[in-house]
C-alpha cells in the first residue's frame, strides 16, 4: 500500500487501528467523515490559496492544479477579498450546522475525533500564524470570532493534554 496524501493517510490509520480518535459506529464514522470533508475543503480552497498569496507563490501550475488560482484575475487584493468571502461562507455554513446538530464540546458530542483535530489546526493556523495576519486584518483580528460553536470545539481540543504538549507554541512560532 502506498499513500502519499496526508488526508488519505490519516483516514487509513484511523480505520486500520483502534484508538481514541476512532469512530465508535458506522453512523459516527459518516458524521465525522462529513466534518473531515469540510476541513479538507477549507484547507484546500481557503488556507492553501492564502498560503500562495502569503508566500508570493507565483507558479500557476500548482495554483491551477488545486483549481484555486486566486491571483489569475485581479491580483493579490482581489485574491484576498475573494478568499475572505469564501472563508466567511464556509465558516458560516459549518457554524449553522453545528448550532443545529452538535451537543458539544466536540463535533460529534463528547468524543474528540480526527476531524476535531483537523478543525483545530485550520482555525489556529488562521488565528495565530504570522502569515495569516492578512486574513486577521480583514476579519477584525480573529477570522472565527463570529463563529462561537467552531471556537467552542477548538477550545475543547486545545484543552486536551496531548494536544497542548504537541502543539505548544508552534502556531505562534510559525512565520507563515
Language model features: what each stretch is:
Residues 80-99:
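Amphipathic alpha-helical packing segments from all-alpha helical-bundle domains
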Residues 19-20, 96-110, 132-135, 160-167:
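Surface-exposed helix-capping loop/turn segments at secondary-structure junctions
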Amino acid at each position: 500500500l502506498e499513500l502519499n496524501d496526508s488526508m488519505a493517510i490519516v483516514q487509513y490509520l484511523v480505520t486500520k487501528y483502534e484508538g481514541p480518535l476512532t469512530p465508535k459506529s458506522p453512523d459516527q464514522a459518516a458524521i465525522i467523515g462529513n466534518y473531515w470533508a469540510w476541513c479538507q475543503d477549507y484547507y484546500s480552497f481557503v488556507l492553501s490559496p492564502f498560503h500562495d498569496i502569503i508566500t508570493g507563490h507565483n507558479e500557476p501550475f500548482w495554483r491551477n492544479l488545486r483549481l484555486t488560482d486566486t491571483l489569475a484575475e485581479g491580483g493579490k487584493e482581489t485574491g484576498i477579498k475573494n478568499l475572505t468571502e469564501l472563508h466567511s461562507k464556509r465558516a458560516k455554513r459549518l457554524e449553522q450546522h453545528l448550532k443545529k446538530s452538535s451537543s458539544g464540546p466536540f463535533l460529534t458530542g463528547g468524543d474528540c475525533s480526527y476531524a476535531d483535530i483537523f478543525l483545530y489546526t485550520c482555525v489556529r493556523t488562521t488565528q495565530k500564524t504570522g502569515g495569516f495576519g492578512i486574513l486577521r486584518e480583514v476579519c477584525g483580528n480573529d477570522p472565527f470570532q463570529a463563529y462561537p460553536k467552531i471556537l467552542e470545539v477548538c477550545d475543547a481540543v486545545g484543552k486536551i493534554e496531548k494536544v497542548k504538549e504537541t502543539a505548544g507554541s508552534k502556531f505562534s512560532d510559525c512565520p507563515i
